[in-house]
A protein has these predicted regions:
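Active-site microenvironment of metallo-dependent hydrolases
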Residues: 1-103, 143-149, 225, 330-347, ...
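Active-site core of metal-dependent hydrolases
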Residues: 208-397, 406-408, 414, 447-450
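His/Asp/Glu-rich metal-coordinating catalytic cores
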Residues: 98-110, 118
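Residue-level marker for buried hydrophobic side chains located in beta-strands
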Residues: 64, 113, 125-127, 235, ...
Length: 556
């Protein structure tokens, strides 16, 4: 890396290592500011009449993140400044005073506050679409990991798998105003009665959950999809693991070309055994993984058996329970899942928090997976210094940001770093990328981040911890965040929350081919025993990884 990188951040052509993943991020562009960089501090350019323009924030930014590595799943990689006004990104480019510098895109006024982004990486806040919010503390774990949008399906230690009655949803929403994340709730979709589904949608559910524990049958899947088409929300599907009422072929037939989000498509989290993975590769079936199987590791098979038994009310002393639990745990489909992610066939990652997944690990498991499959690439040893991993990095970034936003109809608000989007931004030090964020901005305001000893003379004195910032306190969370609802509910009245509400949009027309850096169509084959998986006839395999990136060096 150039000598310029230490004080001012990298320039075009520099390569940045992402933690211990082995992934190489190459800077493809930098704003034209060499020798005239905007800096703040003693004897720096951020002074009135030099780098600061004497103007009100009607002409300048409320907040600027300067000289940061901007990582957007659509626009790619560049070094620039991010301007924020009234909680939204107002521009990305060169920051400064146009009276004293050329080519300024973002005016830094004498009222503008500044976050020094030199050497940091900025990404959109993560979007976790599969959260069993059995404890309110799950939201702390989410934002601590860089997630700023959560779609949940419970509200406390109650068996639910999708919230049903208006009274329960109302209580949940009133409580969730306190959390500094965007929130949506999935209504109970496992019903053959459209009226019971309509009740949860009118109570401001943002989608529907069909689950085998409450019935994933021909009737429930079809009814949920018909209601989703009526209201324009997404259906999250956990298929029939016992194959009692439907096989995987039957489920595909019932879906009938309609858009649907297939949760934990590998199957360990639930679904048709042993071949639910055959749902991947269809243009209308939008697929995701939950994080415990990512990447496929040495102890994954043994770990999952205990989780399945506990989460689904099974008895380890009952042979039939152990038998059906073991049928869900297949090394071959776990290995193939990792490969299908790299091919762009599986489109999203999520946590399945407290329902067999970990709320705070989706970012790091997504990029640990990227590092593992990159290392397994047979051509990697032949790479030259000019090679980089930008395309792979951006593909995996899309899995946790823009693609879930598209699938759940909120991409008009979040999922990207681009003008007009809500300024939900995670800032990372490169050595901790995807493991622990340095600072999380919610609606353009610091809500969570690294903080030091509060009695120290400087703010970075050890011990350093990830904790709430001012944007997570008082009335700020509801001011900086939104509720994900649906148009039909909002037309009937406001939600019982102080925060603003947005309606899902475009959920029913989404296809895999619309997703960013994904959408490969083809045929996944799974043998009758679940021990061989193919993609368009080619066998998919991967050895279980013994050492997972972004783990021991970063957490223990």
């Amino acid at each position: 890396m150039t000598s310029h990188a230490r004080p001012y951040g990298p320039i075009q052509g520099d390569v940045v290592a992402l933690g211990d993943t082995g992934l190489r991020l190459r800077i493809t562009r930098r704003v034209d500011d060499e020798h005239d960089e905007f800096r703040v501090g003693f004897a720096k350019s951020g002074r009135d009449g030099i780098g600061l323009r004497g103007s009100t924030t009607t002409d300048s930014c409320d907040l600027v993140i300067t000289n940061v590595i901007v990582l957007d799943p659509v626009d790619g990689v560049r070094v620039a400044s991010i301007g924020i006004r009234e909680g939204r990104i107002c521009g990305i480019g060169r920051a400064g005073n146009p009276n004293t510098s050329d080519g300024v895109d973002l005016i830094v006024g004498t009222s503008t506050v500044v976050i020094d982004g030199d050497g940091l990486i900025a990404t959109p806040g993560g979007i976790d679409t599969h959260v069993h919010s059995l404890s309110p503390r799950v939201f702390d774990a989410e934002i601590s990991s860089g997630v700023t949008t959560v779609i949940g399906q419970e509200a406390g230690p109650m068996w639910g798998v999708g919230l049903g009655s208006r009274w329960v949803i109302d209580r949940a929403l009133r409580a969730m105003d306190a959390f500094p994340v965007n929130i949506g709730l999935l209504g109970r979709g496992s019903s053959s009665n459209p009226q019971s589904i309509r009740e949860s949608l009118h109570a401001h559910a943002c989608g529907l959950k069909v689950h085998e524990d409450t019935g994933s049958t021909l009737s429930t899947i079809d009814t949920a999809l018909r209601m989703a088409d009526e209201v324009d929300v997404q259906v999250a599907l956990h298929t029939d693991g016992l194959n009692e009422t439907l096989s995987v072929a039957d489920t595909i037939a019932v879906i009938g070309g309609r858009a649907i989000h297939a949760f934990h498509v590998e199957g360990c989290g639930g679904g048709h055994a042993p071949d639910v993975l055959r749902l991947a590769g269809h243009d209308n079936i939008l697929t995701s993984s939950t994080n415990p199987t990512l990447p496929y590791g040495l102890n994954a098979v043994e770990e999952h058996l205990d989780m399945i038994m506990f989460c689904h009310g099974m008895d380890a002393d009952r042979a039939s329970d152990v038998h059906i639990a073991r049928a869900r745990v297949r090394a071959a489909t776990m290995a193939a899942e990792s490969r299908l992610h790299d091919l762009g066939v599986i489109h999203m990652t999520s946590s399945d928090a407290q329902g067999m997944g970990r709320a705070g690990e989706t970012w790091w498991r997504t990029f640990a997976l990227a590092g593992v499959v990159a290392a397994a690439d047979p051509g990697r040893s032949e790479r030259s210094e000019s090679d980089d991993d930008n395309e792979r990095i951006l593909r995996y970034l899309a899995k946790i940001t823009v693609n879930p936003a598209i699938v759940h109809g909120i991409v008009h608000e979040v999922g990207r770093l681009a003008p007009g989007f809500l300024a939900d931004i995670a800032l990372w030090r490169p050595e901790m990328f995807a493991a622990k964020p340095w600072l999380v901005l919610k609606g353009g305001f610091p809500a969570w981040g690294v903080t030091g000893d509060p009695n120290a003379s400087i703010d970075s004195a050890q011990p350093l911890v990830l904790a709430e910032q001012f944007g997570a306190l008082g009335a700020a969370p509801s001011d900086l965040s939104f509720l994900i609802s649906n148009e039909q509910a909002l037309s009937q009245g406001p939600a019982p929350m102080a925060r603003r509400a947005i309606a899902t949009s475009g959920c029913r027309s989404i296809r895999a081919s619309h997703l960013v850096r994904h959408g490969e169509a083809g045929e996944v084959g799974v043998s009758a025993q679940g021990d061989v998986v193919t993609w368009n006839g080619d066998v998919l395999s991967l050895e279980p990884v013994r050492q997972v990136p972004l783990s021991r060096l970063h957490f223990w």
